[in-house]
């Protein structure tokens, strides 16, 4: 069945949930890609809990991510991040948004592969720059040339992100549209008929 003969939205969403079982949908990608906003929307569409790993880290540590970076350094932060993500993954199904560096950890990738389905929100540099320039809470971008930092991170991380189960190009569009494209990409990944039209599954 092709996309023009797709299932009614409810049937495909139910089939997708069935294929997920106890696994989580795990969003990966660079800062500014929209992991939290899109992840939250996907969770709503699937009636699943939404977890943001950075928020979980802040809850556990009682410190903000920038404070953790400043006080303990990136290595200690990554170790805490790994522990938190591994714990969260034990409680699927859910939708989990991870920090930009989380997927670079081999043990974290292994845990995600075992307990989830990874979704890379792939964004172009200009979109990322536009989004991150509006926020002041990005420890890795405290630089005289944040664009160069992002370019370096893209060079280092995109080949690893590309090993994700699903890749969805993101852009400056409504989150409902991107979230629906994520759901259709997951349907294709599992061999499920796509949802009829993105507008039909907005909530």
Swiss-Prot record:
Family matches, as InterPro entries: P-loop_NTPase, Shikimate/glucono_kinase, Shikimate_kinase/TSH1, Shikimate_kinase_CS
Domain of life according to the entry: Bacteria
NCBIfam families tied to this protein: PRK13946.1 (NF010552)
Protein residues bound to ATP: 32-37, 138
Entry keyword set: Amino-acid biosynthesis, Aromatic amino acid biosynthesis, ATP-binding, Cytoplasm, Kinase, Magnesium, Metal-binding, Nucleotide-binding, Transferase
Family membership noted in the UniProt record: Belongs to the shikimate kinase family.
Primary localization: cytoplasm
PANTHER family: SHIKIMATE KINASE, SHIKIMATE KINASE 1, CHLOROPLASTIC
Name by which UniProt lists this protein: Shikimate kinase
Gene expressing this chain: aroK
Subunit details: Monomer.
Keyword rRNA-binding in record: no
Binding site for Mg(2+): 36
EC number of this enzyme: 2.7.1.71
Cofactor binding summary note: Binds 1 Mg(2+) ion per subunit.
Chain segments annotated as coiled-coil in the UniProt record: none
Species per Swiss-Prot/TrEMBL record: Mesorhizobium japonicum (strain LMG 29417 / CECT 9101 / MAFF 303099)
Pathway per the UniProt entry: Metabolic intermediate biosynthesis; chorismate biosynthesis; chorismate from D-erythrose 4-phosphate and phosphoenolpyruvate: step 5/7
């Amino acid at each position: 069945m092709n996309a023009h003969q797709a299932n009614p939205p409810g049937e495909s969403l139910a089939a997708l949930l069935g294929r997920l079982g106890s696994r989580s949908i795990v969003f990966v990608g660079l800062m500014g890609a929209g992991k939290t906003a899109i992840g939250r929307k996907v969770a709503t569409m699937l009636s699943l809990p939404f977890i943001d790993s950075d928020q979980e880290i802040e809850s556990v540590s009682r410190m903000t991510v920038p404070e953790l970076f400043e006080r303990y350094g990136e290595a200690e932060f990554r170790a805490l991040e790994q522990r938190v993500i591994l714990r969260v993954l034990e409680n699927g199904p859910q939708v989990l948004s991870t920090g930009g560096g989380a997927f670079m950890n081999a043990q974290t990738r292994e845990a995600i592969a075992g307990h989830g389905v990874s979704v890379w929100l792939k964004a172009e540099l200009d979109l990322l720059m536009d989004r991150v320039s509006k926020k002041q809470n990005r420890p890795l971008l405290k630089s005289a040339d944040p664009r160069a930092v992002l370019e370096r991170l893209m060079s280092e991380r995109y080949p690893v992100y590309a090993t994700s189960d699903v890749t969805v190009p993101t852009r400056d569009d409504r989150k409902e549209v991107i979230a629906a494209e994520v759901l259709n990409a997951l349907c294709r990944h599992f061999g499920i008929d796509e949802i009829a039209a993105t507008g039909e599954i907005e909530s």
